[in-house]
Amino acid sequence: MFNSLMNFWKGKDFLSQVIDDFSAMLDHSENIFTMVSRALLENDKPENLKDTVYEVDKTINRLERSIRLRIVEHLTLQPTVDTSMCLCLMSVVKDAERIGDYTKNLFEVIELLEKPIDRATFDTYFNGMNDNILKLFKDTKKAFIQEDDAKAKATYQLESRVVKECDAILINLAASDLSTNEGVCYALIARYFKRIAAHLVNISTSVVLPISQLDYFDEKMAVGYDAPK
């Protein structure tokens, strides 16, 4: 399906702009995730971080609306175009928008914390998960923008690991002696990490999945779904 989509894009000026805008959405999301993670885990918090996070989130939302409008206008003017291609685009831009929302939620955890995170304690539970999510950002963009099937399939495996680790974190937190504040904040971080990873993989797997299966990757993983060969 995705090869047809890329052929469809060729020579289409408006879709070239759509891809540029979508790439910008992913870049903005990765940038604020990096800033928020640094503030959360290293207590490296610029004074204007809150304003930056909220402004970038608004930018991501504007890009999503712009992309959707272009697609609708194109379908109106050229109704014979293969609509499944446009449905794919509509789906992945929503995933990109949700990543921005969850990153904003992650920032809000910083405001809930009574004291800065103890990195050693955090690593006991999360074991470098933030680095794995940053890798997912990069691999997702490469998979989608560069039509990299191998990279898309690799994200299946990494996201599966992140999901299982997030579920295990919640079990461990429930049995821990952390303070209520720490326990709740760590649980929220695990939840947001899991959702960010899931939306990233929804995007990357649009390269290898048919349109009818988009957005159901995390449910398939829960029942032992295997990535396409």
Indicate where each model-derived feature is located.
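Cytosolic, long alpha-helical scaffolding segments
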Residues: M1-K229
